[in-house]
Amino acid sequence: MTTTDVFPDALILKYEDVTVEDVEQIVYDAMFPRGPEGAKHTKIFINGRDLKTVNDVLERAAKCMFPPFELAIIVDPRGAYTTASAAVAKTLQFSIIKGFGTLEGKTIAILAGTGPVGQTAARLYASEKASVIITSRDLQKAVSLATRINEELKDERVQGVKAQTAEETGKATEQAEIVLSAGAAGTQILSLNLLKNYAKKCRVVADINAIPPLGVEGLEADANGKEILPRAFGIGALAIGKLKNQVEIELIKKATIEPKGIFDHKIAYAIAKKTVLEKTKEERKATAETPKHWLP
């Protein structure tokens, strides 16, 4: 949909139920008929629900390419990469704006964090040198994911914990300065009572769920840095979604400009981070330039 909005004249061919075994033929059919020059203007967008399958498809597609036949590949499985990038960037933005600093050294709790958005956010937070707690009702699932991310990053920054009960969820947030609710749509993960009684160190809380009941009680979907508890500032799903849409557009545009390359969560986050840091800088400059007699 976004690609059509950005490039209404583009020819888009859709392949459904693609398996890893299908990839080679699809890539070759895209590369060869138009020659090396035409290949530069042919892009592949990998969607999908299961991140393992998405990564397997990406790996196979990349192996099919060789000079001068190389295509740009965009990867955003059901919007998970751009959503996670926007969520992490927004929490960074308000951590800085509210005077709590960058993500480095922070403890982050990602509630219901084993889904596509949660695990992508965990990778991004860990890459920013934060300590990450991933919760799941299934302890083994959380631990397995944490181990996999640590192995990828060659660092011990992520841990998985069980959070099947309200008390377990609350305890998972006790040390967190930032909390991200990454659960399924229409599911409340964190009550205001848990946030108040357990997450006493929390300064920024974000929610990716825009369908009532929302993931965090008391955090409205359109909240954009609203103080929901003393010194705890909330970011709702619509505020995250607005940045997500901007990131997706820029990701697609970037891939169309470049003749080759992989445009994944790392590139998406770089775009999101740059966007919020530039906005933060502009807001600080505007505040500094405001005459003192205008201030309350």
Question: What are these regions, as identified by a protein language model?
Answer:
Residues 156-234:
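Rossmann-like adenosine-cofactor binding region
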